[in-house]
């Protein structure tokens, strides 16, 4: 690495989705003296090499709202950034084997629906019908959204 001696108003460590997003939104707010410090090439580390996933099935309303905003960003990515990110929503299936986990899922579903998250509550039989390759023998149920 070259000797680099420069000052910046903001230094961001990491050029993945969090670092580049932070730099982008700082620039939108008029803070342009920003440097991103990344050891790899951009989009060549964990973010760029991941298959990615955005879910809205959280128990905390703040996390739900953040993920809903993320979905909007990814849905509009091509229009806003000129790059087709090939975003498509296919859903997340969460499975519960323990009664306590199942009760937590059901409680979370109430919160999710209250915040506009389209989520389904599924019995083991419904899960088996949609995903016949899954072993549902020990399941209490699942949620899909």
Label each residue range with its predicted role:
Residues 26-27, 112:
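Hydrophobic alpha-helical packing residues
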């Amino acid at each position: 690495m070259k000797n680099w001696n420069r000052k910046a108003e903001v230094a961001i460590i990491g050029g993945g989705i969090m670092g580049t997003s932070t730099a982008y939104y700082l620039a939108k707010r008029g803070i342009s003296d920003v440097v991103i410090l990344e050891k790899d090439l951009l989009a060549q580390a964990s973010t760029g090499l991941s298959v990615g996933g955005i879910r809205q099935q959280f128990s905390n309303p703040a996390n739900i709202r953040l993920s809903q905003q993320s979905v909007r960003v990814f849905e509009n990515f091509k229009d806003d950034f000129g790059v087709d990110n090939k975003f498509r929503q296919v859903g997340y299936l969460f499975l519960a084997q323990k009664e306590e986990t199942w009760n937590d899922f059901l409680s979370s579903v109430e919160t999710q629906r209250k915040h506009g998250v389209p989520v389904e509550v599924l019995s083991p039989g419904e899960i088996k019908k949609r995903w016949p390759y899954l072993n549902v023998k020990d399941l209490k149920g699942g949620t899909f959204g």
